[in-house]
Amino acid sequence: MVQESFDCYLLDIEGTICPISFVKETLFPFFLQNLSKIIEHPTDDQLTILSKFNINDSTELYNHINNLVLNDIKDPILKQLQGHVWQEGYENGLIKAPIYQDSIEFIKDNGNRIYIYSSGSVRAQKLLFEFVACNDGKETIDLRPSILDYFDINTSGVKTESSSYDKIAKTIEHSEHRERILFLSDNPKELEAASSAGLSTRLVIRPGNAPVEDDTKYTSIRSLSEL
């Protein structure tokens, strides 16, 4: 089988290059554990973000944000706030990103061709790639030098709309040859949107990911080493 060659790779994070459990079992709980402190004693940056919710009552604000997290709502204001909170966890060694080893190697090997697109804020994405777990989680490595750029729902739009991928293709100057961009994700709706915008796609199947009803619609891989 002849492997296809691509100019660049657009990578999803959760369920693609990182276990889907990391977000719900590590990142979300860490955020919620610190939510009361954030609301009661916010930094200037956090206060600016909190004010965007337009909720003055602290209890009501807490309940609103808590519900967004528990229901995994892709709210752009929430994503901004989470990035600020997770920074403290990463920098204090409380959070380390469990990127799959095949993904670490792929990103390093294709360092001049890697882009990231996630619902999480660009700030949160950069933190995740700065503090990647290695050596059984005792140390971290920084993958940021291997990544050209990052996109999120604030900069590019939601991941299930083709217009978002159209915008990304224009940003990375591949509007004329979009089939040379390979988008990897575990979410068929995202793949459909990317495909509609002219990008090539691969469905990534990882342990713990939600079952895909028709996984024959897209070419699937179980490791980035297959590319």
From Swiss-Prot:
Listed GO CC annotations: cytoplasm; nucleus
Cofactor(s), names only, from the UniProt record: Mg(2+)
UniProt cofactor note: Binds 1 Mg(2+) ion per subunit.
InterPro entries per the UniProt record, alphabetical: Enolase-ppase_E1, ENOPH1_eukaryotes, HAD-like_sf, HAD_sf
Pathway the protein contributes to: Amino-acid biosynthesis; L-methionine biosynthesis via salvage pathway; L-methionine from S-methyl-5-thio-alpha-D-ribose 1-phosphate: step 3/6; Amino-acid biosynthesis; L-methionine biosynthesis via salvage pathway; L-methionine from S-methyl-5-thio-alpha-D-ribose 1-phosphate: step 4/6
Residues where Mg(2+) binds: D12, E14, D186
Compartments it resides in: Cytoplasm; Nucleus
Annotated GO MF terms: acireductone synthase activity; magnesium ion binding
Binding residues for substrate: S118, S119, K159
Chief location: cytoplasm
Catalytic activity: 5-methylsulfanyl-2,3-dioxopentyl phosphate + H2O = 1,2-dihydroxy-5-(methylsulfanyl)pent-1-en-3-one + phosphate
UniProt record, GO biological process: L-methionine salvage from methylthioadenosine
Keywords on record: Amino-acid biosynthesis, Cytoplasm, Hydrolase, Magnesium, Metal-binding, Methionine biosynthesis, Nucleus
Entry EC number(s): 3.1.3.77
Family named by the database record: Belongs to the HAD-like hydrolase superfamily. MasA/MtnC family.
Assembly notes: Monomer.
Job of this protein: Bifunctional enzyme that catalyzes the enolization of 2,3-diketo-5-methylthiopentyl-1-phosphate (DK-MTP-1-P) into the intermediate 2-hydroxy-3-keto-5-methylthiopentenyl-1-phosphate (HK-MTPenyl-1-P), which is then dephosphorylated to form the acireductone 1,2-dihydroxy-3-keto-5-methylthiopentene (DHK-MTPene).
NCBIfam families: enolase-ppase (TIGR01691)
Record-given protein name: Enolase-phosphatase E1
